[in-house]
Amino acid sequence: MKILIKYKNIYYTLILIAASLFFPLFYGHKGILPIDSFLIFNGGYNIFNGYYPFKDYWSITGPLLDYIQYFFFIIGKLSWISYVAHAAVFNLILCLFSFYFFLKIELKKEYSFLYALGISILGYGQTGTPFMDQHAFIFSYLSIGFLLLGIKFKKNQYWFFSSFLLIFSFFSKQIPSSYLAIFLFFFSFVYLFFYKKKFANILSFYIGGIFSLFIFATIFVLNKIPFGNFFTQYILYPLTIGDDRFERLSLSINNTVLQFKFLYLAIIPYLAIFYRSRTRK
């Protein structure tokens, strides 16, 4: 029993590794969506055959996923298991980061484990194959996580990785990283106003973003991808899609409340726990 307590984190980590790999690998072989499930597969296949996004084929989705899938095809050959493994690895990253993030902010080990286990199921378990929405969320999630650690511990490396991964999120999908980048831009000035001696934190944040942009700019230059093509396909054209969706947006009770009633109900226990903990203090 003493050994179990001593190595509890190791046991929890091994269980989380197994769970986060199992769910995408299992459900990735259970079914497909005719278009969405093959989108990143085709992108990785194109690069595998010497074609590049924006230059040789039209792309309005994140080019980063195509390149990552290309590397998975190199490592595991051109196969479906290499495709599903892509999703499984990112599910693993999401799960383990969550676990150690919760531990870092001093959440109980048992709670940290259970929350991370739930994340391993909800992460890539729902699709089983790589998709830009999941990747964009994961990178943004990691970015926010590192930012919170940076604020709590005042360490420059956390600030650096926050913006670094935010750029990765943008090149996975334009949102939510664009909204998050705007918010963090203004937040950095507010933070600097209250913590004038922590200029190195903000400097690290911007250096991380610039370094990340430099990596993607280098890829574009090496592959001779025209910037005009990228701007048209990845920035301008998606804006037209957004305009159309915004015009059809309905703010009815059904769309804003009833469709999300179970999410609202799930929040109630957490609010009750939060209220009780505050009253005890």
Region spans (language model):
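Transmembrane-helix motifs of polytopic, lipid-linked glycan transferases
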Residues: 85-107, 142
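Transmembrane-helix signature of polytopic, membrane-embedded enzymes
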Residues: 98-122, 156-157
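Extracytoplasmic catalytic/substrate-binding loops of multi-pass membrane glycan-assembly enzymes
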Residues: 28-43, 53-71, 77-81, 224-227
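Perimembrane helix-loop-helix junctions
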Residues: 2, 179-212, 229, 278
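Short acidic/glycine- and proline-prone juxtamembrane loop motifs at membrane-interface regions
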Residues: 128-137
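Hydrophobic alpha-helical membrane-interfacial segments at the cytosolic entry of transmembrane helices
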Residues: 11-20, 196-222, 259-268
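Membrane-interface alpha helices of multi-pass inner-membrane proteins
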Residues: 120, 124, 158-176, 180-185
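Membrane-interface transmembrane helices that cradle and orient dolichyl/undecaprenyl
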Residues: 104-106, 141-160, 169, 195-197, ...
